[in-house]
Swiss-Prot record:
Residue(s) at site: Important for interaction with integrin: R48, R58, R61, R62
GO biological process, one term: insulin receptor signaling pathway
Species of the source: Mus musculus (Mouse)
Region (C), start-end ranges: 53-64
Name of the coding gene: Igf2
Name of this chain's protein: Insulin-like growth factor 2
Top-level taxonomy: Eukaryota, Metazoa, Chordata, Craniata, Vertebrata
Note: The IGF2 locus is imprinted. Paternal inherited gene is expressed, while the maternal inherited gene is imprinted, hence silenced. It is differentially regulated in the placenta and fetus, transcribed from 3 promoters P1, P2 and P3 in both fetus and placenta and additionally from a fourth placental-specific promoter, P0.
Length: 180
């Protein structure tokens, strides 16, 4: 007795699916640009935050940032992980260090190296897809002038009436009503 056709077809389909998964895993990665790149970094790095260039490679001028690597070349999870920020201290370290300090010890606010509000505005521009021209100062001025021009054009009357009645040679409307 041989193998039934249904089972052999099922085995063939499963092996084909497995082969395709393996090929896709070794194939080229996905390219990410703009808002997709920012959203993916937020997802991968979660509460740790991330850098657009690796902090350890700032001295090396030839190193590429994440935009050059992920937008123009393929990008994978391992590469994205390298741009995640490392937290300064874990929660355990912070809680034990505060317990050691006396209660009357002054606590000064810690400065941030990464301004979240500035990043959020930049990320919002990336998501909205504003062109680079509008992000530049001159571009904003040109956009403002264009907006003012469009507003003035929109509020212009459709028909401009002449100040004098052309049929009666400049006679006023009172005289024309008396004349009838």
């Amino acid at each position: 007795m041989g193998i039934p056709v249904g089972k052999s077809m099922l085995v063939l389909l499963i092996s084909l699916a497995f082969a395709l998964c393996c090929i896709a895993a070794y194939g080229p990665g996905e390219t990410l640009c703009g808002g997709e790149l920012v959203d993916t970094l937020q997802f991968v790095c979660s509460d740790r935050g991330f850098y657009f260039s690796r902090p350890s490679s700032r001295a090396n001028r030839r190193s590429r940032g994440i935009v050059e690597e992920c937008c123009f070349r393929s990008c994978d999870l391992a590469l994205l992980e390298t741009y995640c920020a490392t937290p300064a201290k874990s929660e355990r370290d912070v809680s034990t260090s505060q317990a050691v300090l006396p209660d009357d010890f002054p606590r000064y606010p810690v400065g941030k190296f990464f301004q979240y509000d500035t990043w959020r505005q930049s990320a919002g521009r990336l998501r909205r897809g504003l062109p680079a021209l509008l992000r530049a100062r001159r571009g904003r001025m040109l956009a403002k002038e264009l907006k003012e021009f469009r507003e003035a054009k929109r509020h212009r009357p459709l028909i401009v009436l002449p100040p004098k009645d052309p049929a009666h040679g400049g006679a006023s409307s009172e005289m024309s009503s008396n004349h009838q």
